[in-house]
């Protein structure tokens, strides 16, 4: 069975994300002074003693306001409770019980999930006991005085929490593929996530920038497990104010770093923008495999040549990503969305691929035969002794040469193009490491690598 889920519920600005960070032992959720920072429900692992579980951090609940996001946040909170084994209701010990707390408590009593009442911001253990007693009136049992920032009282809360979780069972760890959905604001990342999930999991709104956390969702398809990461849209730095959006963009960059494959979402109407080029550079820099997802294809007037023309225009801008598979989709209508995971699988396979040293040196030998290494003005010619793959994700090949400085950028690009031509590696960048090596060292290495 999957890990049990613990939902964290409460009104805005009571410290839900701070407590979630404490339980998860990290700073994953955005914590900022602006109320209502967490809009979607976000998942990450937590543990206590010998028990593992998933923490679900939800948006701030308000029942007396129907503006824009609040009905959507209520839906997200209910969805979190429906999949949870237990819930932690967080209240603010410094303000005392509020009307909002009473409304949430009434609502929670109607849910079939055990609820623990955590009275947050009780920084003093002695004063915290007094602050906590005010919350008996909520009718949810024993209030636990805690400090999400300092950790006071969280041990007792967790001791009781794990008694409500299902008994430990063997959990088979699948070979999970982590997929980050990356793109500028409002290109349809959350709509794409929803289309992949088949449910309304991430908040979708026409307002640019409505996904502010990196949100992990685990799905299975054809016995393969995928972790889908929907991120905040990435804007130009000059358009980003210091605050929650700044941290979200940081989170998106971290999502690129920790994923296996990037679904790089591009707006079919706008085409490849300058900001897309900067994003592409970042993806290459992190060595991630890529699937180019051209979204909003339903909004484009098409004839039999349209896809060819679009591909030509896209790769004229993203010429350094010509190896990336490309798919034209509509997240709104579902057009071709079911083909995306096939491309994710093939790109992941190439990203993890290993090539034998013998094959690498066959490619090098043919490449050098067709185009000799350059010669310096002093008449000294570059020489490639041999190559070998030293790592994967991305595939990285070390080339041992007499002097790396003798190989200009044009020749380095030529060698990379020969590896692409002979070995393929579609969907993933490859890295070439040019390493200087003396003749004597090469001779000593001859027993484990074929010289070119």
UniProtKB/Swiss-Prot annotation:
Keyword Nucleotide-binding attributed: yes
Keyword entries, A-Z: GTP-binding, Nucleotide-binding, Repeat, Ribosome biogenesis
Residues reported to bind GTP 2: 183-190, 230-234, 295-298
Record-annotated EngA-type G domain positions: 4-169, 177-352
Binding site for GTP 1: 10-17, 57-61, 120-123
Keyword DNA-binding: no
Pfam family, one: KH_dom-like
Domain called KH-like: residue spans: 353-438
Gene Ontology terms for molecular function: ATP hydrolysis activity; GTP binding; ribosome binding
InterPro entries, A to Z: AAA+_ATPase (IPR003593), G_ENGA (IPR031166), GTP-bd (IPR006073), GTPase_Der (IPR016484), KH_dom-like (IPR032859), KH_dom-like_a/b (IPR015946), P-loop_NTPase (IPR027417), Small_GTP-bd (IPR005225)
Domain of life: Bacteria
HAMAP family reported in the protein's UniProt record: GTPase_Der
Subunit note: Associates with the 50S ribosomal subunit.
PANTHER family, sorted: GTPASE DER
Family indicated by similarity: Belongs to the TRAFAC class TrmE-Era-EngA-EngB-Septin-like GTPase superfamily. EngA (Der) GTPase family.
Function, as annotated: GTPase that plays an essential role in the late steps of ribosome biogenesis.
Protein name: GTPase Der
């Amino acid at each position: 069975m999957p890990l049990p889920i613990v939902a964290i519920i409460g009104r805005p600005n009571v410290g839900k994300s701070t407590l979630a960070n404490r339980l998860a032992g990290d700073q994953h959720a955005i914590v900022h002074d602006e109320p209502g920072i967490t809009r979607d429900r976000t998942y990450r692992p937590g543990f206590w003693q010998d028990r593992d579980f998933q923490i679900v951090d939800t948006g701030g609940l308000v029942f007396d306001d129907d503006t824009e996001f609040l009905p959507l946040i209520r839906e997200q909170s209910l969805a979190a409770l429906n999949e949870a084994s237990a819930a932690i209701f967080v209240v603010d010990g410094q303000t005392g019980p509020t009307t909002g707390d009473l409304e949430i408590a009434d609502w929670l009593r109607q849910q079939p999930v055990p609820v623990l009442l955590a009275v947050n911001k009780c920084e003093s253990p002695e004063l915290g006991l007094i602050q906590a007693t005010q919350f008996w009136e909520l009718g949810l049992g024993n209030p636990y005085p805690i400090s999400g920032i300092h950790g006071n009282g969280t041990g007792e809360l967790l001791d009781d929490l794990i008694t409500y979780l299902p008994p430990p069972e063997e959990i088979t760890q699948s070979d999970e593929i982590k997929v980050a959905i990356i793109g500028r604001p409002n290109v349809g990342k959350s709509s794409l996530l929803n289309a992949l999930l088949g449910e309304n999991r991430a908040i979708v709104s026409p307002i640019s920038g409505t996904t502010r956390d990196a949100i992990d969702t685990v799905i299975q398809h054809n016995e393969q497990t995928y972790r889908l990461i929907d991120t905040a849209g990435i804007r130009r730095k000059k358009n980003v104010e210091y605050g929650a959006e700044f941290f979200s963009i940081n989170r998106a960059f971290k999502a690129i770093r920790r994923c296996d494959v990037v679904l790089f979402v591009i707006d079919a109407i706008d085409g490849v923008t300058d900001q897309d080029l900067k994003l592409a550079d970042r993806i290459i820099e992190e060595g991630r495999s890529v699937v180019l997802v051209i979204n909003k294809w339903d909004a484009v007037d098409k004839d039999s040549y349209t896809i060819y023309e679009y591909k030509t225009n896209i790769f004229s801008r993203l010429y350094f990503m010509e190896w990336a598979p490309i798919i034209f989709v509509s997240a709104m209508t579902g057009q071709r969305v079911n083909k995306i995971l096939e491309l994710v699988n093939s790109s992941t396979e190439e990203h993890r691929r290993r090539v034998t040293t013998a094959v690498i040196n066959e490619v090098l030998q043919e490449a050098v035969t067709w185009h000799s290494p350059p010669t310096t003005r002093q008449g000294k010619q570059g020489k490639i002794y041999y190559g070998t793959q030293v790592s994967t994700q991305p595939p990285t090949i070390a080339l041992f040469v007499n002097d790396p400085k003798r190989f200009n950028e044009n020749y380095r690009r030529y060698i990379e193009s020969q590896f692409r031509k002979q070995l393929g590696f579609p969907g993933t960048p490859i890295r070439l490491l040019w390493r200087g090596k003396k003749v004597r060292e090469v001779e000593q290495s001859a027993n484990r690598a074929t010289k070119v």
